[in-house]
Amino acid sequence: MATIKDVAKLAAVSTTTVSHVINKTRFVAEATQKRVWEAVEELNYAPSAVARSLKCNTTRTIGMLVTQSFNPFFAEVMHGVENYCYKQGYTLFMCNTEGDLEKQKHYLRMLAEKRVDGLLVMCSDLNEQLLTLLEKNTELPMVIMDWGPDSPRTDKIIDNSEEGGYLATKHLIENGHTHIACITGQADKVTCKERVRGFERAHADANLSFNPEWILEGDFECASASKAVDKILSIEESKRPTALFCFNDIMALAAISKIQQSGLRVPEDISVIGYDNIELSAYFSPPLTTIHQPKRRVGKTAVEILLERIKDKDHERRVFEMQPEVVTRSSVLNRLK
């Protein structure tokens, strides 16, 4: 493996000059830079990240704890994170914990050993055990990208779930639906509680009541939505909901599939609105009306906030709030026409 001395010898310069060219720490004549970079390429030289981190007190690496990397919503956020890290010259260590506390402990310890410059935490719900773990690493610049309890010591991304739940339900009501069911995620998750509050507030603003038995608990996965639709379809047709609000697009896809398998039509018989606006939602059959969240922008913003925190650890706490909006496609019938 080539060393910095090999590069210096081939380029006919000192090792100090090679270091300045690679790290861009001092002016070096263009012709000299050209010789150095040609030598680097010819020798396939890779600077020691360990040596550089000891000298500069930075590794130009960021750690990211993720609980559900397979979920399309989180995958799109992660794309925004990775893309912006790359553009800024940072390497991303992505650790998928799947909500396992032992994995979380292991990865936090590993990232600390790697001396990452900062940490992003993206969780489907931030539980107290993970919060306690994170609070033991308060010296590490950190951005929480979660939908759980607040922490005054970290920057945070908020998804504004209550407003999203309100907008989804309001859209259904404005299209003439007064009998609306919803399929939530796990009832104990903060994001679900907030979307239910939005669902209830939209009904109250329209002076409408709702059947609490039509708030059906899912888990953000297809199978739970399919079971929930079975319950809806077991209701006598004349008393059945005309619209269904699913708390993510994956459950909406499963709901549409189940409804169509039963011989009913979407949206003619039952309308469906989703949440997240994942890339696939535009290609559902029918294309899904949903609540948009700026996922890749959220990923980019999280990295921007973290890099500012790395530069200035005493910077005042930042909170970025996503603004949900309705994306109208073809899965909701206007019953007023």
Curated annotation (Swiss-Prot):
Q: Which residues bind DNA?
A: 4-23, 48-56
Name of the featured protein:
HTH-type transcriptional repressor PurR
Q: What InterPro entries does UniProt report for this protein, alphabetically?
A: HTH_LacI, LacI/GalR-like_sensor, Lambda_DNA-bd_dom_sf, Peripla_BP_I, Tscrpt_reg_HTH_PurR
**Entry's transmembrane regions:** none
Q: Which UniProt keywords are present, listed alphabetically?
A: DNA-binding, Purine biosynthesis, Repressor, Transcription, Transcription regulation
Q: What does this protein do?
A: Is the main repressor of the genes involved in the de novo synthesis of purine nucleotides, regulating purB, purC, purEK, purF, purHD, purL, purMN and guaBA expression. PurR is allosterically activated to bind its cognate DNA by binding the purine corepressors, hypoxanthine or guanine, thereby effecting transcription repression.
Q: Which residues bind hypoxanthine?
A: F73, K189, T191, F220, D276
- Entry-linked PANTHER family: HTH-TYPE TRANSCRIPTIONAL REPRESSOR PURR-RELATED, LACI-RELATED TRANSCRIPTIONAL REPRESSOR
Could you describe the subunit structure of this protein? Answer: Homodimer.
Gene3D superfamilies noted in UniProt: 3.40.50.2300, lambda repressor-like DNA-binding domains
What does the record say about domains? Consists of two structural and functional domains: an N-terminal DNA-binding domain, approximately the first 60 residues, and a larger C-terminal domain, approximately 280 residues, which imparts the function of corepressor binding and oligomerization.
